[in-house]
């Protein structure tokens, strides 16, 4: 019997005949000729080795944060990751970014995610945590929609500080557009923190009130508990966004009255990765009304038919693969591998390590702030964690370009988001920031400005 090998023109002719055409050209007859290319002007092909050499040359122009000290923060930070974290998540049992759709078969992955939930619950001070969202921004946006659902649509206003991270705010605005959620901002006071009086004027009929620890300017909001009380008195839910690396040295958001806590888990166990992938924290109080409305997957512990411990995905009727139209969220994948990496790192540090991490970051940030104050204006007084807002007289773009010439990556330009702050930038420090890097930065700034 004759074999039909590719290319098989008989199949092509059969399909053309079925649609009443005699050639491929007729299929594209409606497209103006000027838009159809006869051939692509591509160079001659190269061998794999030649491509390797060319790519290696291009990639060699990149510099790591160890070769070029960076003070660029504003949401993405250089943290040290213990070597065993990468080794463990690269094991074949874990190395997938996708959800186990036959979850009970994947007991190892489910247990790892259950441990992640337990560790985050201990950190944030709330007992119910999901198995992760995409990132902090989507977690915050999902929290806003959740507060509106909890009010059954009778309240559609969600209040955020104007100095919320601008990119997170953009995600929130995108999420809010479809369901018609109104986003209202509260101004900052002379110390760069939430203006309590402005909040009191705007909180009426709000579904939820949001605050960040630390805020976009790197400052610790001093009146978080009071903000929560104002929200609750007005019948609104209190949502707190938090950088979890600070939770060893400050009160947990749950202890400050938060109903919902969101944040960024990838600060543990994950490199910067050009900004992603991430894993958003999402936690709520032990209230079934809240639990049934929270987005994302929940891993629970139970017993199987033989009475043995088993891990399962629980309350799945909330999810889009069960009830798409009525799901609490239509996020259709998750960040399981990122969450497992975070869990391994957190477990490795333990309570003492988490506290020491926060203390070192706080100390390094204070040193950076002190030295920056010698060469530029610090607009807001207060305690900073990681980020420090600095204002210059000279255009910051020029300053940044000069720093790059001196092999130093400067801070994040804030003026494009908040013109009233002038030529301002956020400079960041973490536990990896070395004193000599800060000193080199200050010396360079003295030359430049």
Swiss-Prot record:
The EC number on file is 1.4.4.2
Q: Which reaction does it catalyse?
A: N(6)-[(R)-lipoyl]-L-lysyl-[glycine-cleavage complex H protein] + glycine + H(+) = N(6)-[(R)-S(8)-aminomethyldihydrolipoyl]-L-lysyl-[glycine-cleavage complex H protein] + CO2
Which top-rank group of organisms is this from? Archaea
A Gene Ontology molecular function term of the record = glycine dehydrogenase (decarboxylating) activity
Alphabetized SUPFAM superfamilies for the sequence: PLP-dependent transferases
Root EC class: oxidoreductase
Q: Does the keyword Oxidoreductase apply?
A: yes
| Alphabetical list of InterPro entries matching this protein | GcvPA, GDC-P_N, GDC_P, PyrdxlP-dep_Trfase, PyrdxlP-dep_Trfase_major, PyrdxlP-dep_Trfase_small
**An example of a Gene Ontology BP annotation on this entry?**
nucleoside metabolic process
Listed Pfam families: GDC-P (PF02347)
Keywords on this record? Answer: Oxidoreductase
Q: Which family does the record assign? A: Belongs to the GcvP family. N-terminal subunit subfamily.
Q: What does this protein do?
A: The glycine cleavage system catalyzes the degradation of glycine. The P protein binds the alpha-amino group of glycine through its pyridoxal phosphate cofactor; CO(2) is released and the remaining methylamine moiety is then transferred to the lipoamide cofactor of the H protein.
**Quaternary structure per UniProt?**
The glycine cleavage system is composed of four proteins: P, T, L and H. In this organism, the P 'protein' is a heterodimer of two subunits.
Protein's name according to its UniProt entry: Probable glycine dehydrogenase (decarboxylating) subunit 1
Q: Which gene encodes it?
A: gcvPA
């Amino acid at each position: 019997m004759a074999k039909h090998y590719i290319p098989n023109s008989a199949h092509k002719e059969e399909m053309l005949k079925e649609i009443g055409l005699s050639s491929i050209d007729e299929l594209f007859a409606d497209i103006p000729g000027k838009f159809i290319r006869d051939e692509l002007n591509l160079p001659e092909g190269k061998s794999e080795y030649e491509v390797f050499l060319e790519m290696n040359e291009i990639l060699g122009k990149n510099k790591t944060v160890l070769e070029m000290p960076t003070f660029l923060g504003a949401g993405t930070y250089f943290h040290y990751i213990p070597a065993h974290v990468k080794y463990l998540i690269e094991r074949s049992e874990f190395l997938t970014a996708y959800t186990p759709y036959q979850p009970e078969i994947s007991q190892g992955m489910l247990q790892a995610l259950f441990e992640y939930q337990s560790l985050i619950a201990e950190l944030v001070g709330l007992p119910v945590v999901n198995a992760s969202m995409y990132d902090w921004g989507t977690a915050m946006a999902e929290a806003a929609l959740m507060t509106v659902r909890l009010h059954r649509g009778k309240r559609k206003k969600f209040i955020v500080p104007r100095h919320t991270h601008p990119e997170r705010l953009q995600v929130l605005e995108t999420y809010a557009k479809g369901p018609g959620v109104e986003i209202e901002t509260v101004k900052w006071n002379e110390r760069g923190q939430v203006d309590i009086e402005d909040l009191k004027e705007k909180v009426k009929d709000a579904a939820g009130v949001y605050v960040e620890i630390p805020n976009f300017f790197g400052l610790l909001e001093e009146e978080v508990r009071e903000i929560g009380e104002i929200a609750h008195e007005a019948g609104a839910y209190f949502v707190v966004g938090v950088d979890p690396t600070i939770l060893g040295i400050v009160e947990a958001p749950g202890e400050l009255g938060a109903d919902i806590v969101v944040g960024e888990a990838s600060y543990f166990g994950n490199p910067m990765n050009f900004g992603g992938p991430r894993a958003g924290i999402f936690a709520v109080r032990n209230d079934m009304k809240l639990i049934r409305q929270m987005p994302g997957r929940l891993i629970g512990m139970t017993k199987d038919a033989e009475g043995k411990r088993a891990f399962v995905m629980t309350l799945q009727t909330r999810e889009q693969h069960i009830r798409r139209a009525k799901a609490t969220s239509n996020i259709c994948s998750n960040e399981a591998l990122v969450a497992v990496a975070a869990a391994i790192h957190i477990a490795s540090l333990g309570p003492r390590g988490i506290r020491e991490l926060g203390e070192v970051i706080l100390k390094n940030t204070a040193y950076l702030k002190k030295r920056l104050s010698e060469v530029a204006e610090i607009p807001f007084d207060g305690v900073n964690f990681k980020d420090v807002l600095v204002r210059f007289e000279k255009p910051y773009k020029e300053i940044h370009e000069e720093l790059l010439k001196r092999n130093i990556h400067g801070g994040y330009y804030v003026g494009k988001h908040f013109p009233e702050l002038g030529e301002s930038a956020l400079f960041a420090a973490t536990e990896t920031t070395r004193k000599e890097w800060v000193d080199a930065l200050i010396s360079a700034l003295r030359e430049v400005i």
